[in-house]
Amino acid sequence: MEKQVDVLIIGAGISGIGLAVHLSKNCPQRKFEILERRESFGGTWDLFRYPGIRSDSDMSTFGFNFKPWAKDKVLASGAEIKGYLSDVISENQLKDKIHFGHRVLSANYDSTKKKWLVEIEDNNKKKQTWSANFVMGCTGYYNYDQGYAPKFPKQEDFKGQFIHPQHWPENLDYTGKKVVIIGSGATAITLVPSMVKGGAGHVTMLQRSPTYIATIPSIDFIYEKTRKFMSEETAYKFTRARNIGMQRGIYALAQKYPKTVRRLLLKGIELQLKGKVDMKHFTPSYNPWDQRLCVVPDGDLFKALREGQASVETDQIEKFTANGIQLKSGKHLEADIVISATGLEIQILGGVQGSIDGKPMNTSQHMLYQGVMVSDVPNMAMIIGYINASWTLKVDIAADYICRLINHMDKNGFDEVIAHADPSQRENDTIMGKMSSGYIARAADVMPKQGKQAPWKITNNYLADRKELKDAKFNDGVLEFHKRGEQTANRKPKLVS
């Protein structure tokens, strides 16, 4: 028998849990359920188990607006974040709303019934169909089954362990081992000091090109001080507002004065290295925030490099050998373990094939209305967090907008909403904008497209988005509402090419 729900949330990570709380508080009349393919909640924070896994943005802004992160630790570990999410689930009675081990295979919108028919498979390979008025994509934007794994020349000759961080072996013993980490992004710069601390013999970070890295304190001393003469709530609000402003300010400065921000970042790195490491390894060729700015707590990466427990090589791989990696410069890196921290493989909606009346959708041909609603697709929203600020900031304001939209529809007796796009608004860039990171560049045929102007342009500006989504009117000429039984004219879903 077909199970029916009002709102079906795909994914029980940060986005799905956040949306569920907002729905329970603001749309109590609506029944919702969460489908999660894994056996636990948390998304990223359940999947990644490598040493040192942590947030890369401050927890005062990474925490939900309805549950303060009331600690002075700036960056939290994966386990701490999952514990925080566990508390959110318990405090909001969400446990029975989450269906673990349920993979969504496909979702087809029936324009006559004004409902989504969603095919699901559980871990026992048993299939079932659910129907839903709304489908909410809260799956993040990468493939949980595999990361980006380029094939290196002669990789099969290597006799040691070859590991991708997305599939970290349980109880891996790297004590005294020579470790080479390929990559220079957030994962690599987290792994290096963590594996040094964990007893690795030596850790080498092998990169093709440098990344901008900023040092931040591990403890928020200002928050620590303000709590002594302010209430807990006031101190938290002050800290959150300050950090939101700092995030936005640094990004805006980098866009307007890239040379100045570059000079400041490089000076900060130089002070950390203290002449012990050549600055060429930390001097990128691109401008700050053309790729995501990485952060390290208390300069832990630079400390490991200064003390000789770790090293960095900027070079290209010629081939693997039985006991390491031969570089094009002629240098050979000996390794017992090689870790390929080479990035993510982008995937939208968790790989779910969407369709409208049986006609397949191609997400790369759609835009996002107000950064939330999928263009020309009825009753579907997608929550994708910020690339230049804490992910959760977008979750909160997007979820609040979705709740307002649903309540507007209920008040007026509508069953369907469609954000009709003007094709001339569609840019070639994806919703990630001008970001040049490798994993984003590889996703051009998967990611929704950027729009030229509001309400289709993704600004990645939390302060502007918060005001826009809070004040947004639903009778703007873009959103079209229908009741069951009405014919929907001229809908042309984008076919898979």
From Swiss-Prot:
Native source organism of the sequence: Acinetobacter sp
Alphabetic keyword roster: Cell membrane, FAD, Flavoprotein, Membrane, Monooxygenase, NADP, Oxidoreductase, Transmembrane, Transmembrane helix
A biological process term (GO) from this entry: alkane catabolic process
Cofactor(s) this protein requires: FAD
PANTHER family according to UniProt: MONOOXYGENASE, PUTATIVE (AFU_ORTHOLOGUE AFUA_8G02570)-RELATED
Residues that hold FAD according to the record: S15, E36, D56, F62, V104, V395
Protein name as it appears in the record: Probable FAD-binding monooxygenase AlmA
InterPro entries: FAD-binding_MO, FAD/NAD-bd_sf, Flavin_mOase-like
Record note on cofactor: Binds 1 FAD per subunit.
Source domain of life: Bacteria
Gene Ontology cellular-component annotations: plasma membrane
Keyword Membrane attributed: yes
Compartments it resides in: Cell membrane
Gene knockout outcome: Cells lacking this gene can no longer utilize n-alkanes with C chain lengths of 32 and 36, but can still grow with C24, C20, C16 alkanes or acetate as a sole carbon source.
Binding site for NADP(+): R54, S55, D56, S184, G185, A186, T187, A188, I189, T190, R208, S209, R292, L293
The keyword Acetylation is annotated on this UniProt entry: no
Recorded family membership: Belongs to the FAD-binding monooxygenase family.
Pathway assigned in UniProt: Hydrocarbon metabolism; alkane degradation
EC number: 1.14.13.-
Its membrane topology: Single-pass membrane protein
